[in-house]
């Protein structure tokens, strides 16, 4: 199987899906690997480093000729022309956010494996490290954009406690998963007050126990509680993600209108559509805009701003799956590995993820009923 590592085209994206170390694992197993020129530069990996591990450096067009194309994010629209029948595309594809790319993949007969939908032992194994990074960074961005020169309220999130008692900011975090706890931990490190809004009762108890000795309040998620708590936010971070599906707009425009002027609103799951009615995707170079008097931060690829760390984390997580696909062939790997099967969103043009099918009103078939 010919494996290609392509350079990301998404604005500001510095990650690469495969490290030189992982290229060596593939070539040692007898697989041919091609790497697009400068694919790893943003993460600190030179072309020479890949060549020393057995890869061949190729052009963008040549990389897309591979049987298995390994990416970080979804293909850019300019890359749709390279799709070919039975090609496998691997990455954090977030297909629920774009019906256009899904229809193109169906038309050509592509197989799409989305790392964010791979579930192992009930957890999003590959997404978790990226969620942790996005959560931590969101808390930092909330502090940054709270400053007056960035359009914020002009508040120092830490407060001041030397001979005076000026309280720090309040972070309201919607959702209680990996991204949420990482955001909360950074906010607490900044001496901020934290309110977490979570739906699941068992998770609420877990969070209450985790933060029993911290300045954290955990609130049951209801529309009424959300509307009440968002008014308190100096920084509001939504972390809600439904694997494979587009989430509902739970944070309404009216709720955003009720927020403090100059407060900061961040949606970590904007790459899947987001849960905030007023949010839209932004870029790393142009990350914020103001609407209803609130600063909106909608960067969909936050881990891409710290590519060295993020690349090491994602590459460590995905290599075993990629090796299994290359060693066994995709069909056998799917049969042998239940977690891998949950990542197959489209198989040779057929949608095989229920959430994705529902998001775009498309026909769905169970993956094991589709493969030969």
Identify the role of each PLM range.
Residues 2-104, 108:
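An N-terminal-biased, well-structured beta-alpha scaffold segment characteristic
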Residues 23, 47, 102, 139, ...:
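Generic hydrophobic/aromatic pocket-lining and core-packing "Φ" positions
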Residues 116-160, 270, 275-372:
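Adenosine-phosphate binding glycine-rich loop
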